Amino acid sequence: MTNSISGDQPTVTTFTSSTTSASGASGSLGASSVSTTANATVTQTANATNSAATSSIQTTGETVVNYTNSASAPTVTVSTSSSSTQATATSNKTSQAVAGKITSPDTSESSETSSTSSSDHIPSDYEPISTTENIYENIYESIDDSSTSGPENTSGGAAALNSLRGSSYSNYDDAAADYEPISTTENIYESIDDSSTSDPENTSGGAAALNSLRGSSYSNYDDAAADYEPISTTENIYENIYESIDDSSTSGPENTSGGAAALNSLRGSSYSNYDDAAADYEPISTTENIYESIDDSSTSDPENTSGGAAAALNSLRGSSYSNYDDAAADYEPISTTENIYESIDDSSTSDPENTSGGAAALNSLRGSSYSNYDDAAADYEPISTTENIYENIYESIDGSSTSDPENTSGGAAAALNSLRGSSYTTGPRNEGVFGPGPEGLPDMSLPSYDPTNKTSLLTFLSNPHVKSKMLENSGHFVFIDTDRSSFILVPNGNWDQVCSIKVQNGKTKEDLDIKDLENMCAKFCTGFNKFSGDWDSRVEPMMSAKAGVASGGNLPNTVIINNKFKTCVAYGPWNSREASSGYTPSAWRRGHQVNFGEIFEKANDFNKINWGTQAGPSSEDDGISFSNETPGAGPAAAPSPTPSSIPVINVNVNVGGTNVNIRDTNVNTTNTTPTTQSTDASTDTSDIDNINTNNQTDDINTTDKDSDGAGGVNGDISETESSSGDDSGSVSSSESDKNASVGNDGPAMKDILSAVRKHLDVVYPGDNGGSTEGPLQANQTLGDIVQDMETTGTSQETVVSPWKGSTSSTGSAGGSGSVQTLLPSPPPTPSTTTLRTGTGATTTSLMMGGPIKADIITTGGGGRIPGGGTLEKLLPRIRAHLDISFDGQGDLVSTEEPQLGSIVNKFRKETGSGGIVASVESAPGKPGSAQVLTGTGGDKGNLFQAAAAVTQALGNVAGKVNLAIQGQKLSSLVNDDGKGSVGRDLFQAATQTTQALSSLIDTVG
């Protein structure tokens, strides 16, 4: 058999005889020995430009392949002898088959072990190998029951050649280390004829098995690079392999008998049709992918065969190839077999890409559809091609035509999955590309709405897609609903007046098209304000009067715009009676023309709405609320602004008593300005037990925010201005709310103030804030009031004690400046002066009967303040101010000047002291002597009457003295010589008399 190839290579005549010995481990073919001796002569002729030179290479060798069922490591022995001679321009290949051995003249001599002149495109991986890169470029496999002279022709019931990357290829693990130094000698197709076989290396029937170069047990070998480094002649073995498969036995693998089909060599006759430039295939080693052909019947396993004339071509790496790791890194430099044409048909064809008959053509990777791809070398350099063989694999299935390479029809069809699986081409890569969601178009559908429901309209218009379609015309917002022939109107941007307006042909009652709808909507918006004004001012009152209904709020339900006569007629609302049958139309139903303005000349244009500056429809959840979720954390709540802010009263509880500080409050503003820094809303009353409830004035200490010291009235006070007056107590401040509770469950502050207000009204009677008639002794003090309100929420009613009077007097101008108040007293108090703010301060209440000395506050120069400067002058001023500023319920009613703080500051300036300071000395009082008065029977009644009269007289005297002190009229009671004897004697006499009467009453009673 002669085969000539025209190409760019020189003419080569090759005589090859090789012997290969190998032993394989168990699990390959079993214990067997195969000896194959081949001697072949191949003549190839090529015409080069301006050259007719030819060359002949004769190689003679003998190869013996021995297979043993051994578990030891395999060994390979290759003996080759070759010679090279120069031949004439034309040489013939002669071969003779003698009992399975081909003999030819032995003209070989020692020569090179590789024919490097046969190829110009050797990849860097295979420097010593010259022809391995182009071995699998074009494999035409013909399987038939009859002879064929062309490898592209087929006859009989066609066979399906599997694609390069067969369906079982994905099962392989083809690690890079395994095959980088291996030069494509691993894989040969094995043909099995006439009967089914589960083992592609075994044969049954009359078939002959072509063992591969490395034998059928190749998977048992260690495929390391070191194994094949010394092998130099394996690259030229596959140049021309003819495999014959027929219905009868054959002793020579190159010979065929019967109706056998010839398999052209890897570099078949049609190879010259391709541009096989070296640059195309530099990085291609092309050994990894061969498809398997199965004829005559369906098979789900490409390695198995069934049918009479079927032949199974195993893949290059055999059926056991699935044992290998087929990592992508293996084939980085491999672009693998871009040109494999597989022809399957019932008739001859001169073009491997074309098919005729009832068969389907498997296009090669570089097949007819490959022209759609840009096949530049740069395209596929980074492609490792073990996973992607250009995504165009056509699978041919015989028996009938098929338009879908993955589908099968007919009796003998078999579906070969593509490299990327049969499911890869079942649908688009992004099946949801046209649906809502990721990778697709957004959902632009509009919600529905109820045109008769205002809330539904507002909800509809608040949708972002709807807002993007809204327009503005003449200050009105509109949404044109072309589906309903209507528009939603927001007059003048007032969302509370939103309404839906239906627009129809007035005669036919049909909906308008889009153009007419937009035109009429523009006219309506342009004349809406003028129409509304004319309706409200003229038409509606007139029509309401005619209809006998109340005017106002009656909107028209229909407006007809006549484009022909350029008029507008409005029809008012029809009530149920007017809408009933047989009712004479009223004024509403007759309609009246209204002025719409110049809408027929030129309607205003629609404009887009800038929602960045224009407010959208309001909803119930408008506004953002910030709530502190951590109790006790975050900034304190600011006081709520109110024009009726009340003064802040801080209750300072000390060991010695309770200070009620009325802080300065600017009532002209709406925000309370407290002067304390405390945020403790509770009041500590644990140290309030020592408060004497017999005096209400000694517990009041009035300061302002500028005062550093604490002052008191008729009590123990501090003479140091720097003391804060809070050594042991806590300060309570109501900063956040005028009605804040004192303590957790205490009463509101205004309730406490109301109780204080009632108490002050009693102890400071008379006009002008009680400046001339108080304070009077009562049954409880101001501290008692506050304490009761804090603890129980209620307080006792304040009642003045007629026999107790808080009397004091200033001394004469030139005297010692002291006034003694002589009243009945319990045991005298120690003659020590205690600081009001000291930790051991005692009660500040006045002790009954003890001599009291109140120093007159003088100016810095030592002179006496004209008109007096005692602390008692301040309280009436505060009392008068409170009467003006607060009503009987304790609510602030006046914010007129002066303020409370300014009153205190003015008093401080008048006294000339840095603070309100007064000292009180307590001395042991002289115990009064009582004499028992005796009388005869019947005098007891007179005695009681006399005692009552004396007591009343003394009360009058005490009241007059008190009035004199308050009115600064002491000069009429004491002498100016400084002795003050008159006043002192009077009080001493009153004291003695009172004591005597008390003893008498006790004795008599």
UniProtKB/Swiss-Prot annotation:
Major localisation: secreted
GO molecular function, one term: SH2 domain binding
Region Disordered, annotated ranges: 1-36, 74-128, 191-214, 343-365, 611-645, 661-748, 792-847
Keyword Isomerase: no
Compartments where located: Secreted
Keyword set, alphabetical order: Phosphoprotein, Secreted, Virulence
GO terms, biological process: negative regulation of apoptotic process; positive regulation of ERK1 and ERK2 cascade; positive regulation of MAPK cascade; positive regulation of peptidyl-tyrosine phosphorylation
GO cellular component, one term: extracellular region
Keyword Electron transport attached: no
Top-level taxon in the UniProt lineage: Bacteria
UniProt biased composition (Polar residues): 1-10, 191-205, 343-357
Post-translational modification, as annotated: Phosphorylated on a tyrosine on attachment to the host cell. Tyrosine phosphorylation is temporally and spatially associated with recruitment of actin to the site of chlamydial entry. Phosphorylated Tarp seems to remain cytoplasmically exposed on the inclusion membrane at one side of internalized elementary bodies for several hours after entry.
Compositionally skewed regions (Low complexity) per UniProt: 11-36, 74-121, 661-700, 715-734, 831-846
Any Pfam family matching the protein: DUF1547
PANTHER family to which the protein is assigned, alphabetical: PTHR36975, TRANSLOCATED ACTIN-RECRUITING PHOSPHOPROTEIN
Family: Belongs to the chlamydial CPn_0572/CT_456/TC_0741 family.
Summary of the function given for this chain in its UniProt record: Appears to initiate or participate in signaling events that regulate the actin recruitment, which ultimately leads to internalization.
Record's miscellaneous remark: Transcribed from mid to late cycle in the chlamydial developmental cycle.
Protein name: Translocated actin-recruiting phosphoprotein
Upper classification of the organism: Bacteria, Pseudomonadati, Chlamydiota, Chlamydiia, Chlamydiales
